[in-house]
């Protein structure tokens, strides 16, 4: 295997399962790319080369022995450093968890391993998943493969950038307010935030428990679907896990591409599908090139047979305030467990228990987790709880009701993923409000718990990707994949590859075959 740039999950898995590829050769090709290119990008916090080789050899041995190597046989994946991995350091990109080696495995990573996937290492992220630019990592930022001067988005910036740069074929991520979809849009790849409870949170380090959604990244919608089929499903170890059968996500992609259902015309994979377009997601202040690309994508979906219908999500204007009240309140509770006593970083020479707590947390947490802990503690104070947190919970219900009403009129809702393309490093770091507003179009699906898929739908004149967001009803991942695959079947945006870091200054983007 000489060149794995742009190789799909299916191409690798099918090749390994058929004996045309060796998992070990594929793994070595990706490890070589990581060694050569990741110093310029910063996607990986830890590369588990020995472990990856061992896992690849096990896949090859299983096939040679006539055993099923799994649906993701030999597929090299990256793991966001928020998923605990037994025997492998897990830090959430924070100093306070430096040296923490979990004694157990997350459900998601275990399911991927059982399916034959080869984990290459742990991916960089915003500290404790708090951020929209990957500038908050205690280990340094991730750079966008399309322009090293621009952010990759966050918090799953390492995952999105690694997939875009072909440093893995797919990756895991988590999405609390847009942390899969926004970096997918900024890096020109695909990513899904499934329905809340569709994918187990067991072994996912908590930020805001009622908002955290594990999901997947891939170069295409098909890649994302293949990973999610393995990751999804009921888990008795997660009290919020939904006991519902896993959808046929890859079949939904095929239906969108081919329009094979009865009565459909070839190329009309969305015949009969109603797509809602909410005015609230196209407000003044949106980048003109972003809006133009998304409007063009909507037109393309219409040509694929979909009917575009106007819908209203009237409480969208309250989504950002509601989100940041709830997520900071939950974060202040979840992060109270990091005290220097049981695991992770511990300050030196503390003379009392109170000093141990205060100095450990002061030295171990970065600025953004401290900011959110303080905000959350404030809104949960006696006398303020009802005025802030209680009101936010009622607003959350209103937002969920908006989606429920909209889905009586349409099958899926399509919007921009972000009102802007990727911004430059440092451009918003000193202004928390502007940074938080980068999530304005992604937080509402988290508050409502509905699935949402992001994919590439164009590029700015400056060569930066633009993202499309497809939102489905609860447990409606299949309609998201069908719409996304129908769009990819009619366009080539998902095939464009960023040049390797050494050549970023010159040359047009390449197109994968």
Model-derived features: positions:
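An N-terminal boundary/leader segment
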Residues: 1-53, 57, 299, 303-305, ...
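Short, well-ordered beta-strand elements within core beta-sheets of diverse protein domains
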Residues: 12-18, 78, 96-101, 212-219, ...
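Glycine-rich, small-residue loops and helix-cap segments
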Residues: 19, 30, 74, 114, ...
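Cytochrome P450 core scaffold surrounding the K-helix E-X-X-R motif
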Residues: 37-41, 85-94, 423-425, 478
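Long amphipathic alpha-helix in the N-terminal Rossmann-like dinucleotide-binding domain
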Residues: 50-60, 116-117, 126
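Enzymes and membrane/adaptor proteins characterized by extended Gly/Ser/Thr/Asp/Glu-rich
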Residues: 71-108
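Short glycine/serine-rich loop segments
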Residues: 104-236, 446-467
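A short helix-breaking turn/cap at a secondary-structure junction
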Residues: 193-297, 315, 350-359, 489-512
